[in-house]
Amino acid sequence: VIFLSEEMHRRAYNQVFEEFEAGVEWSEEYYDELMNTVGGGKPKMRHHFGRYGWPVSTLGPAPETDELREALVDALQERKTEIFRESVAAGRAEARPGIVELVDEALARPDLRTAVCSAATKEAALEVLNAILGPGRLARFDLLLLGDDVSRKKPDPLIYSLASERLGVPPERCAVVEDSKIGLEAALGAGMPCYITYTGSTRDQDFTGAQAVVADATQLSLALMCPAGG
């Protein structure tokens, strides 16, 4: 939602697969499929390996127990996060059109409470959010809920239900901005209105139930999403 991330994530996964000699490479088309099916990095890898087989890697033979499989996924994800953070530090993260302006408008409204709810690991998410929004803006959010903070990833509604609870705002009075069917399902599952800013990877998904489906945040109106006194 906040920045153009899909290709950066895909390249980071492919680099870590190469470093671990896992014999895996995710094409753009296949990564789109994963993005539209599974939320979170570790669940994506579990889904892929469960479907196509667990790989031999520099850590040893193909893992046969749950413990060894989780150890492999943990190691891959840890290194992938490092690679991704290096890309962010190199200035490769770019905000999606209109999102910074929408954030500024929301932060300027004293009647609104604001939150970021992301499946990304805490380290990677904070790196990106600081790079895109800056520490000053980020500090003004009322709540940050990141991948490490919840036990179940989108499309499970847990992250949004928890946000509603912690903010003290009923779900029906929240407004969620998402970019995928997985995110939409999570928001709707929590009972929240959801506005979609689709990406090149998600534009053809079924967004039935969304309040609006637009190309980017320049086409969203905070006044309509969150009417003053509404």
Question: PLM features: residue spans?
Answer:
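Active-site neighborhood of HAD-like aspartate-dependent phosphohydrolases
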Residues: V1-E33
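Asp-based, Mg2+/Mn2+-dependent phosphohydrolase catalytic module
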Residues: V100, D104, T121-G230
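Conserved phosphate-coupling serine/threonine residues in phosphotransfer and NTP-handling enzymes
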Residues: V1, S118-A120
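Short, basic/glycine-rich phosphate-binding loops at helix/coil junctions
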Residues: L76-R85, L143
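Short, acidic loop-to-helix structural element flanking the phosphoryl-transfer center
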Residues: E70, R85-V116
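Helix-loop "lid/cap" segments that line or gate small-molecule binding pockets
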Residues: N14-F17, G40-D66
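Conserved SAM-binding loop
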Residues: I2, T114, V176-V177
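Short, surface-exposed acidic
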Residues: E21-L34, G53-L76, G136-F141
